[in-house]
From Swiss-Prot:
Keywords: Cytoplasm, Methyltransferase, rRNA processing, S-adenosyl-L-methionine, Transferase. S-adenosyl-L-methionine binds at L70, G102, L121, S122, S123, M124, T125, F126. InterPro entries: Alpha/beta_knot_MTases, RlmH-like, tRNA_m1G_MTases_N. Homodimer. Specifically methylates the pseudouridine at position 1915 (m3Psi1915) in 23S rRNA. The keyword Methyltransferase applies. This is Ribosomal RNA large subunit methyltransferase H. It comes from Dictyoglomus thermophilum (strain ATCC 35947 / DSM 3960 / H-6-12). Gene3D superfamilies: 3.40.1280.10. It catalyses: pseudouridine(1915) in 23S rRNA + S-adenosyl-L-methionine = N(3)-methylpseudouridine(1915) in 23S rRNA + S-adenosyl-L-homocysteine + H(+). It is found in: Cytoplasm.
């Protein structure tokens, strides 16, 4: 399985970097996963920032990717449902799943419309840094569920 995670903005908090690195270390033996950090335009107005971020996100998408965008108004599913969805997607071995995590303003409507699925991690709002860490934890949990292995150690 190939997974790409597009994130608007960088990780500034060291404890989140440590968590991201830990989950990548756990996932890489089983899943080809990469994270692409794209620039944030948060210093601009919301409308302009969303347009600029939309442009760079679209440039980083390829044909055949199954796109899952994270958005607070997306579908809320359990970890078990996420695992089933993730591992039963109709993708070939050479294609990939791409997750998109927007910046402080979220993502544009065009990005949402380009998505195959819109996922909400919670009714609460998280920074892009926390969203990335939570997403990686949920991908790892989904892998453990799919492999019928215990998660807690």
């Amino acid at each position: 399985m190939n997974i790409k995670i597009i994130v608007i903005g960088k990780i500034r908090n060291e404890f989140i970097k440590a968590g991201v690195n830990e989950y990548l270390k756990r996932l890489l033996p089983f899943i080809n996963i990469k994270i692409e950090f794209l620039p944030s335009f948060s210093e601009l107005s919301e409308k302009i920032a969303l347009l600029k971020e939309e442009e760079i996100i679209l440039k980083n998408l390829r044909n055949g990717e199954f796109i899952i965008t994270l958005d607070k108004d997306g579908e809320k599913i359990s970890s078990e449902e996420f695992s089933k969805k993730l591992f039963k997607l109709p993708i070939s071995q050479n294609s990939q799943i791409t997750f998109i995590i927007g910046g402080i303003y979220g993502v544009s409507e065009k990005i949402k419309q380009s998505s195959n699925f819109i996922l909400s991690l919670s009714s609460m709002t998280f920074t892009h840094e926390f969203a990335l860490l939570i997403l990686l934890e949920q991908i790892y949990r989904a892998l453990k569920i799919q492999r019928n292995e215990p998660y807690h150690y």
